[in-house]
Amino acid sequence: ASYTHLMHGIQHFVYNYSSADHLSFGAAVARVSPIERLIPLIVCGVIGGVGWVLIHRYGKGVVDIKTAVSGKMDMNPITTVLHATLQIITVGIGSPLGREVAPREASAGITTFLVKHFDIKQEDRQLLIACAAGAGLAAVYNSPLSAAIFTLETLLLTWNIRAMSAALICCGLATFVTRQAGVGDVIQYTMAQPSLGSHYVEFSIALGAIVALG
């Protein structure tokens, strides 16, 4: 929620609009002049370039989430949070970087730091770090189920009951807290609902059975 509010605040400041205008980010950018789009991108490049050079030169090393979950290397909380915050700042200005990586990194980095101070088995540490990353994804996109699936399929590589329960609880709680923090429950991407006839359902059932048996 903090990162979402930070990103929106930067967008509003840079492109001179507010939540009261009820504009999407794309619409807000489209209404400013070309020079007012160019200058923020130049500033974004400078901030991003200098920031990432400083992080990689003076930081403790950026460790990706999968490596942290595997237990091969620990994420440094300060370096990770700075790296994630820099991503959000550049995204707010107009960088094409995705905004979902930063909350996942920050959540996993902070959790890595916390679990080191408790007597927790390696297996439990991996589960907590993965669930923290999934919770970050759930919060930023308001999608607890998709985030739980991401946690299980991409990070934990397992579908056992224990992992499923932990992922669903963490992602669900993250989404609930984010909604209460004022981010709202707006669906990020809306899709037209297709009209499906009964033959599509029959085909899907048959195809699912064939794939499962194969």
Predicted regions and their residues:
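Alpha-helical transmembrane segments and immediately membrane-proximal extracytoplasmic
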Residues: 1-214
